[in-house]
Amino acid sequence: MEVLKRENPLIHMITNYVTVNDLAQVTINYGGLPLMATHHDELKVITKMANGLLVNIGTLEPYQMESSMISMKIAKEKGIPSVLDSVCVQVSKLRRDFAKKIILEGEPSLIKGNLAEIKTLIGETSNSIGIDSFEDSLSENTKNKIKEYAKERNLIVVVSGVVDFITNGEESASVKNGTYKMSKITGTGCMLGALLTLALSFYDHKDLRFKEVVKAVSTWGICGELAEERLREKEGLMTFKYNLLDELSIINDEIIKEREKVIYE
């Protein structure tokens, strides 16, 4: 049977107020339609309409937490792919408890985080206290625990870092695309969360979703590399940011195939 790729999927986002505009823009640039809704009566309709759901816990507030839980449960019930971006889950008990609750009751399709955030979710100790993780080394022991975690919960885990690691417990991949400058732009991790939600929503076939997720991670890194290459003398981080969004809007499969640095395990 021929597999058709969904065009312009609708993505429902419940996200933080720091990067909300950037998430909307990258969603459009990558071929999706963003819609932000948090009112309880409205989101019960919006989530059911959507092709994908993103919940980002960057700025937690009581009403938003309730909205996130309602939408996650709807997505679970309707079979809509969902992503939990576990921003700063290592920082407070509130975040840890909420993330664990939404994973248990909402059963997201994918969990994204940096190494410190993912280590916290799998029960390992992390020394990081902010959005940036300085724990760049992913040990084999931790990698195996992440694989077990993903397999037990039937989800994909994306660990962002110098080398990104993606696994569903059965398949795993490492992605070496990207540039250090991406870590200096507020929200590049959140923007990746939007791309991952789109990646899941492009296909209804679960078998295709893992490779599409890996492609999204690699694509984002390649856009960073291209954005850096475009910089001229005396152009700094803000020019880099706009170059990054620019590259996402014009990148194509030929460029991705030429530049991707992906190792499947």
UniProtKB/Swiss-Prot annotation:
Binding-site list for substrate: M36, G187
Reactions the enzyme catalyzes: 5-(2-hydroxyethyl)-4-methylthiazole + ATP = 4-methyl-5-(2-phosphooxyethyl)-thiazole + ADP + H(+)
Keywords assigned by UniProt, alphabetized: ATP-binding, Kinase, Magnesium, Metal-binding, Nucleotide-binding, Thiamine biosynthesis, Transferase
GO annotation terms (biological process): thiamine biosynthetic process; thiamine diphosphate biosynthetic process
Enzyme class: transferase
Cofactor(s) annotated in UniProt: Mg(2+)
Organism domain of life: Bacteria
Any one Gene Ontology molecular-function term assigned to this protein's record: hydroxyethylthiazole kinase activity
Keyword Repressor in annotation: no
Pathway noted in the entry: Cofactor biosynthesis; thiamine diphosphate biosynthesis; 4-methyl-5-(2-phosphoethyl)-thiazole from 5-(2-hydroxyethyl)-4-methylthiazole: step 1/1
Annotated residues for binding of ATP: K112, S160
EC number: 2.7.1.50
Pfam family, one: HK
Protein role: Catalyzes the phosphorylation of the hydroxyl group of 4-methyl-5-beta-hydroxyethylthiazole (THZ).
NCBIfam families linked: PRK09355.1
HAMAP family: Thz_kinase
Stated family: Belongs to the Thz kinase family.
Protein name: Hydroxyethylthiazole kinase
Species this chain originates from: Clostridium perfringens (strain SM101 / Type A)
Lineage: Bacteria, Bacillati, Bacillota, Clostridia, Eubacteriales
Gene: thiM
